[in-house]
Regions:
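C-terminal edge and immediately downstream basic/flexible tail or linker adjoining helix-turn-helix-like DNA-binding
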Residues: 1-6, 57-60, 71-85
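Short intrinsically disordered, low-complexity segments
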Residues: 27, 65, 72-73
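Short, locally clustered residues in the helix-turn-helix/winged-helix DNA-binding domain
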Residues: 31-32, 46, 78
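A short pre-motif secondary-structure segment
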Residues: 41-45
Length: 85
């Protein structure tokens, strides 16, 4: 988990009446709106808990580029969740 993971947790938990199934469905909708690279990086890092080093070997890109993609993905997901709460 990276420094932006808390942003998603806080966004999902901000509404006391937001149930887990609804939160998970909304998160999946938000992820589906991401460009392919951001979606892949987000899923590998957030859900599969892979390190950037491992992802960089798989995707053959720099760790810096991956961190930027992950950051953008988190910001887009957070914005999506805020619009749909």
């Amino acid at each position: 988990p990276g420094p932006y993971d808390g942003v998603l947790s806080r966004t999902l938990l901000a509404d006391a009446y937001f149930d887990g199934d609804e939160a998970q469905a909304l998160l999946q909708e938000a992820i589906a709106t991401l460009p392919e690279v951001q979606r892949v990086v987000f899923n590998l890092h957030y859900f599969d808990e892979m390190k950037y080093r491992e992802i960089s070997q798989i995707l053959r890109t720099s760790e810096g580029a991956l961190k930027a993609s992950y950051h953008l993905a988190v910001m887009k997901i957070s914005a999506y969740l805020k619009r749909h709460d």
